[in-house]
Amino acid sequence: MILTLTLNPSVDISYPLTALKLDDVNRVQEVSKTAGGKGLNVTRVLAQVGEPVLASGFIGGELGQFIAKKLDHADIKHAFYNIKGETRNCIAILHEGQQTEILEQGPEIDNQEAAGFIKHFEQLLEKVEAVAISGSLPKGLNQDYYAQIIERCQNKGVPVILDCSGATLQTVLENPYKPTVIKPNISELYQLLNQPLDESLESLKQAVSQPLFEGIEWIIVSLGAQGAFAKHNHTFYRVNIPTINVLNPVGSGDSTVAGITSAILNHENDHDLLKKANTLGMLNAQEAQTGYVNLNNYDELFNQIEVLEV
């Protein structure tokens, strides 16, 4: 069983418009509302590829119940921790080939709720074999909250796949308890090191070999349309991917995380892990719906991916 954590989920609302008129009335014909958050995208893709998955995180109020019901309708198991605050909305306005987003900050978690979730998590940890943590921390939690979760996973021997960025990731990296996998994009990688971006292989090798990343088994760096660069223990890989028609890239990173987590759970070899992860990321990009993959195209893309030891 895989446990996914989305500590700051949202109800994602999409408003497609022919044109966005500022300081005027905009009427929307079709509205899409989904259970959102990076971890829930990971959850949906894991469910689609047939992995046993359980979703958790904080939810509150009517919007929190909306998320729970959406997962129920999709036959996805969940064990959220209820809080006093209201789960947030995140609004995307699609207009003239552009996307304007309005993102609520979300509820503030108090000390009692923060401690209560840790106890809740410890109970869930007893019955899972991998944990995928995605996205930002809600207001009120200390920056080391993910590190506290990772410490408990490490004590139980449960691998952690972590997808976050900025100060939250920096805090985890400076902590003695390390995730099994991190998945920064190339910009995030060099920001962590306060270095100028450099896509050359030698620079990437030096970057992921810095002391900041010591103790992390897998570092998988997204290069966007150029594929990926990865380090597994002391081995480096370059992943070349085919050119595809991209319909909606949002959620592709989350689908990649789903592939990594699935491969970790099933003890797949390095090449298959990297190919599965990138295949699912590309499949998501070919769909309008976030966190959705058409598995009919899986084998074709999987076989076109090239993984080279460098």
Swiss-Prot record:
Gene3D superfamilies named in the record: 3.40.1190.20
Protein name, per record: Tagatose-6-phosphate kinase
Enzyme class: transferase
Pfam family, one: PfkB
Family according to the record: Belongs to the carbohydrate kinase PfkB family. LacC subfamily.
Domain of life: Bacteria
A GO-annotated cellular component: cytosol
InterPro entries linked to this entry: Carboh/pur_kinase_PfkB_CS, LacC, PfkB_dom, Ribokinase-like, Tagatose/fructose_Pkinase
Organism: Staphylococcus aureus (strain JH9)
GO biological process: D-tagatose 6-phosphate catabolic process; lactose catabolic process via tagatose-6-phosphate
The entry's keywords: ATP-binding, Kinase, Lactose metabolism, Nucleotide-binding, Transferase
EC number(s) reported in the record: 2.7.1.144
Biological or metabolic pathway of the protein: Carbohydrate metabolism; D-tagatose 6-phosphate degradation; D-glyceraldehyde 3-phosphate and glycerone phosphate from D-tagatose 6-phosphate: step 1/2
Catalytic activity: D-tagatofuranose 6-phosphate + ATP = D-tagatofuranose 1,6-bisphosphate + ADP + H(+)
Single GO MF annotation: tagatose-6-phosphate kinase activity
